[in-house]
């Protein structure tokens, strides 16, 4: 995992857009992001570590998603664009990268890189939890392939609320997230 300030220059979203300004893990933690490195080993020890993590956090369900040009065919470009629309969820977004690589961009919040995009580069063995209410977006990198395990507390659901839509800033999950960040920054 590598996190840094996104350069916000026009161009292919799948390129690094690295400003050279690194963001350390404690800063991500202030924004509510949980990160763990759980290397994928041939013996399968990673699976028991994921099971343990899921049990600790109350994740009862999981599935796998693969994003490739071959797998999605003509829908690939449209799907990538939809993932890259700035949005939030009312539940945590949990991903364990099994193969390939990509980027999660998260929006800074009050007192922590406010309104700047922070790009988090992920590869196989990286586990990330984005808190409910955080604005974010996702894209594969220039390799155009990623396979991830998605974990869910209840029934699998993935409802994005676009920042462009009326009312998104007023969702309870957004208010709760901002309050959590305020407390974390001032604590």
From Swiss-Prot:
Its main location: cytoplasm. GO terms for molecular function: acireductone dioxygenase (Ni2+-requiring) activity; acireductone dioxygenase [iron(II)-requiring] activity; iron ion binding; nickel cation binding. It catalyses: 1,2-dihydroxy-5-(methylsulfanyl)pent-1-en-3-one + O2 = 4-methylsulfanyl-2-oxobutanoate + formate + 2 H(+); 1,2-dihydroxy-5-(methylsulfanyl)pent-1-en-3-one + O2 = 3-(methylsulfanyl)propanoate + CO + formate + 2 H(+). Pfam families: ARD (PF03079). Binds either 1 Fe or Ni cation per monomer. Iron-binding promotes an acireductone dioxygenase reaction producing 2-keto-4-methylthiobutyrate, while nickel-binding promotes an acireductone dioxygenase reaction producing 3-(methylsulfanyl)propanoate. Catalyzes 2 different reactions between oxygen and the acireductone 1,2-dihydroxy-3-keto-5-methylthiopentene (DHK-MTPene) depending upon the metal bound in the active site. Fe-containing acireductone dioxygenase (Fe-ARD) produces formate and 2-keto-4-methylthiobutyrate (KMTB), the alpha-ketoacid precursor of methionine in the methionine recycle pathway. Ni-containing acireductone dioxygenase (Ni-ARD) produces methylthiopropionate, carbon monoxide and formate, and does not lie on the methionine recycle pathway. The lineage of its organism: Eukaryota, Fungi, Dikarya, Basidiomycota, Agaricomycotina. Pathway: Amino-acid biosynthesis; L-methionine biosynthesis via salvage pathway; L-methionine from S-methyl-5-thio-alpha-D-ribose 1-phosphate: step 5/6. The keyword Nucleus applies. One of its GO terms (biological process) is L-methionine salvage from methylthioadenosine. It comes from Cryptococcus neoformans var. neoformans serotype D (strain JEC21 / ATCC MYA-565). Its cofactor is Fe(2+); Ni(2+). Keywords: Amino-acid biosynthesis, Cytoplasm, Dioxygenase, Iron, Metal-binding, Methionine biosynthesis, Nickel, Nucleus, Oxidoreductase. Fe(2+) binds at residues 87, 89, 93, 136. It is found in: Cytoplasm; Nucleus. The gene is ADI1. This is Acireductone dioxygenase. The keyword Amino-acid biosynthesis applies. Coiled coil: none annotated. One of its GO terms (cellular component) is nucleus. Belongs to the acireductone dioxygenase (ARD) family. Signal peptide: none annotated.
